[in-house]
Amino acid sequence: MVRFTSVLALLILTLSLPALAADAEPVAPKDMDGITLYKTYCKVCHTADSEHGEYTPMDLIMDQWDEVFDAMDESHAEAKLETTDGESVPAFLGGKLLDRIRKFCVDHAADSEEPMTCG
């Protein structure tokens, strides 16, 4: 009976976690890590069926990611998201946020020790 109760309690907890997360306050960009910033601000445009092409960290090697981010101001000058209130993506993300995304992409590039697709 104890085992059944434990399993039932675990099942109830597992099923209630998504509801708890839905009630959570949204995370401000300044509090996001690199992967969350990437999923929130990059992945929305860079999908498989996008005219901009799909990109995940392991699609490029580290040096290529550095080149992408070095050219970000120019290449994304016209890129705007609904969440940026009309600011270009580079202007909205600015220094520290863009640095976190860059670090995430470089750290998980194809030639890194931990390549990642970012799901």
Regions found by a protein language model. Give the residues of each.
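C-terminal capping alpha-helices of c-type cytochrome domains
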Residues: E87-G119
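An amphipathic alpha-helix signature
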Residues: K39, M62, D66-E74, L98, ...
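Bacterial N-terminal signal peptides
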Residues: V7-S16
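The canonical Cys-X-X-Cys-His
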Residues: Y38-D49, I101
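Electron-transfer interface patches adjacent to heme c in soluble/periplasmic c-type cytochromes
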Residues: T56-P57, M62, E67, T84-D99
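Positively charged n-region of N-terminal signal peptides that target proteins for export
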Residues: M1-T5
